Amino acid sequence: MVRNIMAKEFSRTRRIAQQLQQELAQVLQRDMKDPRIGFVTVNDVDVSRDLSYAKVFVTFFEEDKAVVQEKLNALISAAPYIRTLVAGRMKLRVMPELRFIYDSSLVEGMRMSNLVSQVINQDKAKQQQFGSEEASVEDEVLGDDVADDADETEGKD
């Protein structure tokens, strides 16, 4: 019995977190006119069990850490206003207090993907450069093996 109540509670917080993520994304794209924030992506929302706090994980497509910190500070200062806008769109008795946290995982993932792509391209270039030399060496070695095989079959007849 207790387990079912806890499972329902967690699924409710998960549903609220998903809806909060969608509403925050819309509010930040359409309703926020602060030029300091710019383009922001809401990656995830983690709501506390009692629904009093929500950690909002965001990403900015900026490499400069100072610019990222400025944008994050602008979001943090606008959090009460954003909370009011989102509260008008959601039917909750208590709207969680928003805590914005910069999530570098997306930027880090893109950086890692670019590094992997660079290594793959370098390997392809090396294969093309050395591939023709290796192919001619393999032909010479295989040619000798074929000649040896021919000599062996002639001796058996």
Swiss-Prot record:
Keywords from the UniProt entry: Cytoplasm, Ribosome biogenesis
GO cellular component: cytosol
Biased composition (Acidic residues): 135-157
Residues covered by region (Disordered): 127-157
A Pfam family the protein falls into: RBFA
BP GO annotations: maturation of SSU-rRNA
Cited Gene3D superfamilies: 3.30.300.20
Subunit structure: Monomer. Binds 30S ribosomal subunits, but not 50S ribosomal subunits or 70S ribosomes.
Protein name as it appears in the record: Ribosome-binding factor A
Organism encoding this protein: Shewanella baltica (strain OS195)
